[in-house]
Amino acid sequence: MNENLFTSFITPTMMGLPIVILVIVFPAMLYPSPNRLINNRLISIQQWLVQLILKQMLLIHNSKGRTWALMLISLILFIGSTNLLGLVPYTFTPTTQLSMNLGMAIPLWAGAVITGFRHKAKASLAHFLPQGTPITLIPMLVVIETISLFIQPMALAIRLTANITAGHLLMHLIGGAVLALTSISPAAATITFIILLLLTILEFAVALIQAYVFTLLVSLYLHDNT
C-alpha cells in the first residue's frame, strides 16, 4: 500500500500517547549535572557560535532590548534543533505544524507589541501614520498599517511552516523516485540519489537559516518596541 504523502506530518503516537512526551523527557534524564560538564573543543565551538549569533542580533538593540538576549538565544536553539531533528528518518518535525509555529509567533509578537505600548506609547502609535502623510490618505494608511501589524505573527509562522514543509515534501518525492527507478534504470536512480543527497545537505542549511530568520524577525519586532 502506498503511504500518504502527508503521513510524515501527522503527530506519531504510541499506545495513544504522543511520542513527543518521550522526546522531551528522555533527553532531560540524560542531561549532565554541572559537575559532569567539561571544557573541550566542542563546548568552545558552541560558546563561540552562541556569542556570534547574539552579537549579530543585539547590534541594533539598546541596553533595555539586550535584556531579551536569553530568550532570543533559547528560541534559535530550540527551533534549530527541532528542524535538524526532523531530518532524522522516522521522526516528526513539529515546525511543520502551523499550530505550533503560531503558538510561538503570536505570544512573542504580542509581548513585543505590549512592551512597546507600555514604554513607548506615542512612538508605537506613530507607526500607524508615517510623517508627511497627506490628510486624504490618513484613514486608509491607518487601516493598512493596522492590518500589516496583525499580519506579522501569521507571516512569521507561515514562513517557517512553508519552508520546512516544502523541503520535506521534496525529499519525500525524490526518495520515492529513487526507489521506483532502482528496478527500472539503475543509472537514473544513481543520479536521482545524488540529487537527494545534495537536497539533504541543502535542507540542513535551510533548517538553520529558518531558525535564524524566525529569531531575527522577533528581534526586529522587539527593537521596534523597546
Curated annotation (Swiss-Prot):
Which GO BP terms sit in this record?
proton motive force-driven ATP synthesis; proton transmembrane transport
One GO cellular component term noted in the UniProt record for this chain = proton-transporting ATP synthase complex
Q: Subcellular location, in the record's words?
A: Mitochondrion inner membrane
Keyword Mitochondrion present in the record's keywords: the answer is: yes
- Keywords on record: ATP synthesis, CF(0), Hydrogen ion transport, Ion transport, Membrane, Mitochondrion, Mitochondrion inner membrane, Transmembrane, Transmembrane helix, Transport
Q: Does the keyword Ribonucleoprotein apply?
A: no
| Catalytic activity annotation | H(+)(in) = H(+)(out)
Please give the name of this protein.
Answer: ATP synthase F(0) complex subunit a
Species name for this entry? Answer: Dugong dugon (Dugong)
Provide the organism lineage as a comma list: Eukaryota, Metazoa, Chordata, Craniata, Vertebrata
